[in-house]
Structures are given as C-alpha cells and as structure tokens.
Amino acid sequence: MNPIIAAASVIAAGLSVGLAAIGPGMGQGTAAGYAVEGIARQPEAEGKIRGALLLSFAFMESLTIYGLVVALALLFANPFAGS
C-alpha cells in the first residue's frame, strides 16, 4: 500500500470519529440540561421526559456509531488502497 494513502486513511479515520462525536456530544449535553430543567419544573412528568430523553440519546448516539463504522472501514477495508 502506498504510504501516503495509508497515512491519509489513518488521519481520515481519526477525523471521522472525532467530528462525528462533536455534534451528538453537544446535543446530548443540551438535551440533558433541558430535561433536568423540565423535570425540576414539572416533577410529575418525569417518566415522559425521561423516555423521550433516552430515545433522543439513542438517535444522537447512532451518528457517532456511523462515524466509527466509517473509521473502521477506512482502517481495515480501505477502498482507496487498491490491490
């Protein structure tokens, strides 16, 4: 494998995981903050708020997992490496 392609693949894999984690990380922090605020304001709605929060966390975390899949594809099944 060409060393330039190998180096670019490693850099791209690191960037894909890092950048894919920034957005969901900030979103989860914001959502958790608003959930705590909502529960503090209306404690009887805790169950509904928690359910919606966990579902939204799952959707946000799926974006990070997609970034991890792209990174693993670049590292172990690199389509740019050729034969």
Swiss-Prot record:
F(1)F(0) ATP synthase produces ATP from ADP in the presence of a proton or sodium gradient. F-type ATPases consist of two structural domains, F(1) containing the extramembraneous catalytic core and F(0) containing the membrane proton channel, linked together by a central stalk and a peripheral stalk. During catalysis, ATP synthesis in the catalytic domain of F(1) is coupled via a rotary mechanism of the central stalk subunits to proton translocation. It is found in: Plastid, Chloroplast thylakoid membrane. This is ATP synthase subunit c, chloroplastic. PANTHER family: ATP SYNTHASE LIPID-BINDING PROTEIN, MITOCHONDRIAL (PTHR10031), ATPASE PROTEIN 9 (PTHR10031:SF0). Its main location: plastid. CDD domains: ATP-synt_Fo_c_ATPH. The record marks E61 as: Reversibly protonated during proton transport. It comes from Stigeoclonium helveticum (Green alga). GO terms for cellular component: chloroplast thylakoid membrane; proton-transporting ATP synthase complex; proton-transporting two-sector ATPase complex, proton-transporting domain. It comes from the Eukaryota. Disulfide bonds: none annotated. Belongs to the ATPase C chain family. In plastids the F-type ATPase is also known as CF(1)CF(0). It is a multi-pass membrane protein. Keywords: ATP synthesis, CF(0), Chloroplast, Hydrogen ion transport, Ion transport, Lipid-binding, Membrane, Plastid, Thylakoid, Transmembrane, Transmembrane helix, Transport. GO terms for molecular function: lipid binding; proton-transporting ATP synthase activity, rotational mechanism. The chain crosses the membrane at residues 3-23, 57-77. PROSITE patterns: ATPASE_C. Pfam families: ATP-synt_C. F-type ATPases have 2 components, F(1) - the catalytic core - and F(0) - the membrane proton channel. F(1) has five subunits: alpha(3), beta(3), gamma(1), delta(1), epsilon(1). F(0) has four main subunits: a(1), b(1), b'(1) and c(10-14). The alpha and beta chains form an alternating ring which encloses part of the gamma chain. F(1) is attached to F(0) by a central stalk formed by the gamma and epsilon chains, while a peripheral stalk is formed by the delta, b and b' chains.
